[in-house]
Curated annotation (Swiss-Prot):
<dbReference type="InterPro" id="IPR050222">
    <property type="entry name" value="MATE_MdtK"/>
</dbReference>
<protein>
    <recommendedName>
        <fullName>Multidrug resistance protein MdtK</fullName>
    </recommendedName>
</protein>
<keyword id="KW-0997">Cell inner membrane</keyword>
<feature type="transmembrane region" description="Helical">
    <location>
        <begin position="53"/>
        <end position="73"/>
    </location>
</feature>
<feature type="transmembrane region" description="Helical">
    <location>
        <begin position="387"/>
        <end position="407"/>
    </location>
</feature>
<dbReference type="GO" id="GO:0042910">
    <property type="term" value="F:xenobiotic transmembrane transporter activity"/>
</dbReference>
<dbReference type="Pfam" id="PF01554">
    <property type="entry name" value="MatE"/>
</dbReference>
<feature type="transmembrane region" description="Helical">
    <location>
        <begin position="127"/>
        <end position="147"/>
    </location>
</feature>
<keyword id="KW-1003">Cell membrane</keyword>
<comment type="similarity">
    <text>Belongs to the multi antimicrobial extrusion (MATE) (TC 2.A.66.1) family. MdtK subfamily.</text>
</comment>
<keyword id="KW-1133">Transmembrane helix</keyword>
<feature type="transmembrane region" description="Helical">
    <location>
        <begin position="93"/>
        <end position="113"/>
    </location>
</feature>
<dbReference type="GO" id="GO:0005886">
    <property type="term" value="C:plasma membrane"/>
</dbReference>
<dbReference type="InterPro" id="IPR048279">
    <property type="entry name" value="MdtK-like"/>
</dbReference>
<feature type="transmembrane region" description="Helical">
    <location>
        <begin position="11"/>
        <end position="31"/>
    </location>
</feature>
<dbReference type="InterPro" id="IPR002528">
    <property type="entry name" value="MATE_fam"/>
</dbReference>
<dbReference type="GO" id="GO:0006855">
    <property type="term" value="P:xenobiotic transmembrane transport"/>
</dbReference>
Length: 457
């Protein structure tokens, strides 16, 4: 029991800074929305449309680079720290290549935006302008993620938290300058949010790079001179590990976007109630997602040390802590659901629907916690392909079709409206949780030599 208590303390010490960093990132999006809305409703809508395209594109790159964390954690645990610098440099090369692809996609996103049904031309122009300003921040964001993953792989999660709050503090005044045109800058409205956010990502990257260069604990990692050329073997391995994570993230984001589109014809009340419940659920999701990042670090580190039993302890402890957190957030959601909905909207119909959907959200929080921590465990074992197949099957083969049938058809029961899609979420997330656990058990039952051989690749 003592080893689980000790492991839980170490997991929480890693996870809490990640949670706070995520809060800062979420707050940046909130600030952009509020400040753009203060300028005009059209500008706020433009930022919302632009963000809905930016997120899937940049999260694809973000997911690809998540492969660095278990690689670095494993090298650190095995005492091969001299190889970390090379892996980080390959991460920067990969981030550079992906940045170019993301920037090309975002530059041409105007074709998608202008093809939207009945979109106002002025709104479309502002959304395109916002994206074309924001895309210059893509390299800064992805380079920052490489540096952050280096720190997190070395079990240092506080620098990411500090840089997140630094970004938030810089974002507010820079937004103000470019939205309203102060200090000789042009008045750009919502487009100014894109300029400000792009600048903030570069500030965060430069600050993180400065920390890494001056941190005593990383002196041995920056001994090698010169930046070096791309290593095709190392980059191929990073892509093999990262691509399934990137695709899983992409399909998860697009799933919720597709559901939002399917709910939109049902009416204003249904859309508003669905959005409130989804927004609050996303806030609660920060807790297990951050814990999953900590579990990846601990499992990777323990495997690097050559201890499959300690890796199992880290995995089980992470699941136990995650389930306890989910039970607490579920009780909180059920108890205060009406009060939470009232914070978003005071329309009685919207509040009633949002409160009903939050009951379903409370049910799936436990499954969601298990599946996302399970994903973190599998990343620690470097078993990322299964993450993609499980996620795709659970969400797109089981969850979405079930939700569609329950919400919009009479095949099983009378049409349930938005609640049907939320039942689909429960089916999809529960399926993912079960499959993740089965895969984890399969991996852990393999001979230690095979597990360690995979981890060392």
């Amino acid at each position: 029991m003592q080893k689980y208590t000790s492991e839980a303390r170490q997991l929480l010490a890693l996870a809490i800074p990640v949670i706070l960093a995520q809060v800062a990132q979420t707050a940046m999006g909130f600030v952009d929305t509020v400040m753009a809305g203060g300028y005009s409703a059209t500008d706020m809508a433009a930022v919302a449309i632009g963000t809905s395209i930016w997120l899937p594109a940049i999260l694809f790159g973000h997911g690809l680079l998540l492969a660095l964390t278990p690689v670095i954690a494993q090298l650190n645990g095995s005492g091969r720290r001299e190889r970390i610098a090379h892996q980080v440099r390959q991460g920067f090369w990969l981030a550079g290549f992906v940045s170019v692809l993301v920037m090309i996609v975002l530059w041409n996103a105007g074709y998608i935006i202008r093809s939207m049904h009945n979109i106002d031309p002025a709104l479309a122009d502002k959304a395109v302008g916002y994206l074309r300003a924001l895309l210059w921040g893509a390299p800064g964001y992805l380079f920052f993620q490489v540096a952050r993953n280096q720190c997190e792989g070395l079990a240092k999660t506080k620098p990411g938290m500090v840089m997140g709050f630094l970004g938030l503090l810089v974002n507010i005044p820079v937004n103000y300058i470019f939205i309203y045109g102060h200090f000789g800058m042009p008045e750009l409205g919502g487009i100014g949010c894109g300029v400000a956010t792009a600048a903030v990502y570069w500030v965060m990257f430069i600050a993180m790079l400065s920390y890494i260069k001056h941190a005593r604990s990383m002196r041995d990692i920056r001994n090698e001179k010169g930046f070096g050329k791309p290593d095709s073997v190392a980059m191929k391995r990073l892509i093999q590990l990262g691509l399934p994570i990137a695709l899983a993230l992409f399909f998860e984001v697009t799933l919720f976007a597709v559901v939002a589109l399917l709910v939109s014809p049902l009416g204003i009340v249904d859309v508003a109630g669905h959005q409130i419940a989804l927004n609050f659920s996303s806030l609660m999701f920060v807790l297990p997602m951050s814990l999953a990042a900590a579990v990846t670090i601990r499992v990777g580190y323990r495997l690097g040390q050559g201890s499959t039993l300690d890796a199992q302890t880290a995995a089980r402890t992470g699941l136990g802590v995650g389930i306890c957190m989910a039970v607490v957030t579920a009780i909180f959601t059920v108890t205060l659901r009406k009060h939470i909905a009232l914070l978003y909207n005071d329309n009685p119909e919207v509040v009633a629907l949002a409160a009903q959907l939050m009951l379903l959200a409370a049910v799936y929080q436990i499954s969601d916690s298990i599946q996302v921590i399970g994903s973190g465990i599998l990343r620690g074992y470097k078993d990322t392909r299964s993450i993609f197949f499980i996620t795709f099957t659970a969400y797109w083969v089981l969850g979405l079709p079930s939700g569609y049938i329950l919400a919009l058809t009479d095949l099983v029961v009378d049409r349930m409206g938005p609640a049907g899609f939320w039942m689909g979420f429960i089916i999809g997330l529960t399926s993912a949780a079960v499959l993740m656990m089965l895969r984890m058990r399969y991996l852990q039952r393999q001979p230690s030599a095979i597990i360690l051989q995979r981890a060392a690749r």
